[in-house]
Amino acid sequence: MDIKRTILWVIFSLAVVLLFDNWQRANGHQSMFFPTPQTATTTAAAPGSTPAGDVPSNASTAAAAGSQAAPATGAASQAPASEKIVISTDLLRATIDTDGAIVTKLELLDQKDHDGNPMVLFDRSVERTYLARSGLIGGDFPNHTTVFAASPGPRDLGTGNDVSITLTADKGGAKLAKTYVFKRGSYVIDSRFDVTNDGTAPINPTLYLELARDGGAVEQSRFYSTFTGPAVYTDGDKFHKITFADIDKGKAQVPAPTNSGWVAMVQHYFASAWIPADNVKREYYVNRVDTNFYRIGIQEPLGTVAPGASVSTTARLFAGPQQARMLEAITPGLDLVKDYGWLTIVAKPLFWLLEKIHALLGNWGWSIVALTVLIKLVFFPLSATSYRSMAKMKDLQPRMTAIRERHKGDPQKMNQEMMTLYRTEKVNPLGGCLPIVIQIPVFMALYWALLSSVEMRGAPWIGWVHDLSTPDPFYILPVLMAVSMFVQTKLNPTPPDPVQAKVMMFMPIAFSVMFFFFPAGLVLYWVVNNCLSIAQQWSINRMLGTNNKAAPAK
């Protein structure tokens, strides 16, 4: 019966791992076992250039995922040389290129990369391309390939509450003025688009707002992966992600035209989103622009503009960390870009509780320890039931071994005597499994809550752990993880099969190797959980006398 129990556990564990890996791949993540090689650095968008057909056509054409949008640009008129303008606030440093009037580099000043430099989100460099673009279609109008002229004015927030810049271009009978407003303490850039018909005939311009980036993954680990790619939200269809693979295969779908919603680009810990004004009709599109270069966007028809008339519209551009409370306050559904995995309903409340604990303790590492202790206390009755069952099984081990020896050649008789022994001693051989199975969703939810939380970036714990989002630099926590797992196996009943026993002894080593590459915050959670489990199991064993004696064989 012990062998069957162990086999069931192995099958169950393997099934959980394989299901998790399938879920990873179904949601656009890399497989843990057979990762798909990433395509080389994007060939699109070298600095100062754009691919052919880079300006979108109308949404009904562009929405056909995987196809290349038709060019909408005409012959370029004489234009001034472009320049780069840097706007600085307390949270952002934005480099705006007048060639297109777009932010070609956005640094998050309070978010550091692993080298201690400001995190770069938008970028147009040799290594990567990630841009928020806008312009007009429906004619030979100013777009993100047109050179704009920048208005004079302050470029630094200083002691003020906001700083703004207006960039203007005139082309094809349409004058477009883009105004960006950067505010203190905000990752949202308020944007205003003023269109004036300075020609002699009516025009029908459409404003497009798009996020374009290469398909390269960021901050990925060999043993876990997170989603990178476009996402869209509307009041009707709600939130859904679009994988680069689906775009390549022509399987990507976007919502029907509506008057609500936004588009986003998501990566681990960070996101960007174009959010148009409320109750304005919009159409969505997503496609591949060039090799390994993708975009998702919104088109907003501005109606007919008579000669000499003007029309204006607004939008907000968010670019920053996935801080749930902040995202909720910006627009409905934006907090969904934070990926809690398939146990969101459990993970979100757990992270809410973790935030409350952090407000008291002021240290994310100790907050993880405290939350793990609280969860362990909540599940104490279930865990106690499991450990009592395992302790009794360990107590019966000599008698079970004797039964196996007596009935080596008669499995049926052996199983009958085993069942009689279980009934006599009132032991359920699966009693140690079910309580643990019930707890697995909570532990998996906390795993995802920690993995997805940007708050762990750069957050220290003690001594050598300076960043809970990166692996332990000295591998102390993974070693403690292996030791704690080894101690747990010693407290459990010893498998009767020598090969089985060796496998159980090898598992701590295998798991510790995997945890060498996990973020320190996740490993800290598992170490604390294991140590609490050891303390609880040891105390129950001691209470039942299992640590000091074993039932005599009969």
From Swiss-Prot:
Q: Which Pfam families match?
A: 60KD_IMP, YidC_periplas
CC per GO annotation: plasma membrane
InterPro entries assigned to the protein according to its UniProt record, in alphabetical order:
Membr_insert_YidC, Membr_insert_YidC_N, YidC/ALB3/OXA1/COX18, YidC/Oxa/ALB_C, YidC_ALB_C, YidC_periplasmic_sf
Q: Does the keyword Transmembrane feature in the UniProt annotation?
A: yes
Tell me the compartments it is located in. Answer: Cell inner membrane
Q: What does the record say about its membrane topology?
A: Multi-pass membrane protein
Query: Where are its TM segments located?
Result: 3-23, 360-380, 430-450, 468-488, 508-528
For biological process, the GO terms are:
protein insertion into membrane; protein transport
Stored Gene3D superfamilies: 2.70.98.90
Determine if DNA damage is one of this entry's keywords: no
Q: Which GO terms describe its molecular function?
A: membrane insertase activity
Keyword annotations:
Cell inner membrane, Cell membrane, Chaperone, Membrane, Protein transport, Transmembrane, Transmembrane helix, Transport
- Per the record, where are the segments of Low complexity compositional bias? 40-52
Annotated stretches, region: Disordered: 40-66
UniProt cross-references to HAMAP family, sorted A to Z: YidC_type1
Function, in words? Required for the insertion and/or proper folding and/or complex formation of integral membrane proteins into the membrane. Involved in integration of membrane proteins that insert both dependently and independently of the Sec translocase complex, as well as at least some lipoproteins. Aids folding of multispanning membrane proteins.
This protein's name: Membrane protein insertase YidC
Gene it is expressed from: yidC
